[in-house]
């Protein structure tokens, strides 16, 4: 009798712990995703592990993925796979804005994120009635912040259909669906008319392009003459040394875990922009002092990682989450360590800002 009572008690405690970790502790900072809602985008549950293995195999040597035209052409499809694998985990553990921002004294991560996004609208001099393009919009966190801050209309493009559906749902919930539109497409060949946008921006998105010239060229094409473009670029800084094994390991880890066909150098960005016809108005690494470290949130999230790892393992064991989710979650944790090292050593920045303008008269 006592044994039975103890067994029932243990079972009750176990279920209570599952409830606590999954439903109470398992929500994202920005509500909308719970651990039990985790999906792998449009990938069916039985294909998750295979898709993860294919992704990891393709990006095992990042800079080799774009060395030939044939391999470069495969990059968009694997970026799509990457976002199928990680979108729900990002929303659950990070929020609706898939980017970093400098920490602000006495302000929450959410507030720091909003300020970082609103800076884009201010740089673009965005106004009510303007039509802006969000190049690589994800699930639309920046889009909604910029539309609300500026009064502009925003059209976002993402290669991932699952993100399109998530962004549209968030737009409706925020009451911004009349001013925020989302299109599924490749930003290397955008389905928009020439000179159809007043301004454009990309927040930590063009790093997925094998050649930056291609995406910058498309942005140049769809901007109206005189239109402004702001981009936050992931780059290696002048402190990076290719003969330093620790530097190489950190950068390769960032590239492998974030679907990047090779990070570009900081000093390349402006020249590439000029090559496609842009005027460079401003260039600044927003991570430099007096800005506070952008990687603080990653370091503070280590406890959350162990909690979330336990949640993911429990859900996989209960067959609520598909096989392969644990591997994806582990990959993202390891990538976070590489990102932190890149930030602490100063060899990497995710927010090298360039402000560009399409000339009023084409040369």
Curated annotation (Swiss-Prot):
Its EC number is 2.1.1.143. InterPro entries: Methyltransf_11, MeTrfase_SMT, SAM-dependent_MTases_sf, Sterol_MeTrfase_C. It is found in: Membrane. Pfam families: Methyltransf_11 (PF08241), Sterol_MT_C (PF08498). The keyword Lipid biosynthesis applies. Keywords: Lipid biosynthesis, Lipid metabolism, Membrane, Methyltransferase, S-adenosyl-L-methionine, Steroid biosynthesis, Steroid metabolism, Sterol biosynthesis, Sterol metabolism, Transferase, Transmembrane, Transmembrane helix. GO terms for cellular component: membrane. Disulfide bonds: none annotated. One of its GO terms (molecular function) is 24-methylenesterol C-methyltransferase activity. One of its GO terms (biological process) is methylation. It catalyses: 24-methylidenelophenol + S-adenosyl-L-methionine = (Z)-24-ethylidenelophenol + S-adenosyl-L-homocysteine + H(+). The chain crosses the membrane at residues 6-26. It comes from the Eukaryota. It is a single-pass membrane protein. Pathway: Steroid biosynthesis; sterol biosynthesis. Belongs to the class I-like SAM-binding methyltransferase superfamily. Erg6/SMT family. Catalyzes the methyl transfer from S-adenosyl-methionine to the methylene group of 24-methylene lophenol to form 24-ethylidene lophenol. This is 24-methylenesterol C-methyltransferase 2.
């Amino acid at each position: 009798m006592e044994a039975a009572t103890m067994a029932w008690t243990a079972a009750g405690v176990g279920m209570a712990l599952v409830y606590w970790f999954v439903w109470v502790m398992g929500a994202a900072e920005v509500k909308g995703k719970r651990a039990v809602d985790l999906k792998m985008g449009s990938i069916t549950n039985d294909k998750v592990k295979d898709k993860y293995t294919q992704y990891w195999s393709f990006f095992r040597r990042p800079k080799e993925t774009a060395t030939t035209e044939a391999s470069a052409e495969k990059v968009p499809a694997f970026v799509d796979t990457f976002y199928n694998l990680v979108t729900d985990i990002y929303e659950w553990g990070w929020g609706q804005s898939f980017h970093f921002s400098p920490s602000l004294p006495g302000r929450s991560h959410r507030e720091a994120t909003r300020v970082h996004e609103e800076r884009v609208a201010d740089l673009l001099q965005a106004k009510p009635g303007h039509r802006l393009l969000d190049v690589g919009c994800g699930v639309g966190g920046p889009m909604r912040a910029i539309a609300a801050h500026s009064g502009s209309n925003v059209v976002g493009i993402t290669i991932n259909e699952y993100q399109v559906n998530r962004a549209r749902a968030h737009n409706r919930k925020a009451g911004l669906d009349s001013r925020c539109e989302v299109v599924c497409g490749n930003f290397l060949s955008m389905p928009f008319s020439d000179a159809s946008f007043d301004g454009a921006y990309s927040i930590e998105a063009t790093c997925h392009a094998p050649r930056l010239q291609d995406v910058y060229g498309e942005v140049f094409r769809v901007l109206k003459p005189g239109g402004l473009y702001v981009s936050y670029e992931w780059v290696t800084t002048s402190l990076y040394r290719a003969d330093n094994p620790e530097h190489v390991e950190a950068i390769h880890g960032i590239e492998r875990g974030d679907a990047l066909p090779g990070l570009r150098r900081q000093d390349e960005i402006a020249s590439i922009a000029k090559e496609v016809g842009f005027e460079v108005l401003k260039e600044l690494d927003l991570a430099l002092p007096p800005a506070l470290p952008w990687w603080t949130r990653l370091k503070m999230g280590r406890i959350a990682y162990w909690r979330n790892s336990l949640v993911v393992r429990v859900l996989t064991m209960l067959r609520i989450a598909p096989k392969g989710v644990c591997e994806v979650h582990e990959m993202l944790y390891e990538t976070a360590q590489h990102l932190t090292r890149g930030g602490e050593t100063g060899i990497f920045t995710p927010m090298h800002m360039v402000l560009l303008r399409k000339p009023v008269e084409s040369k």
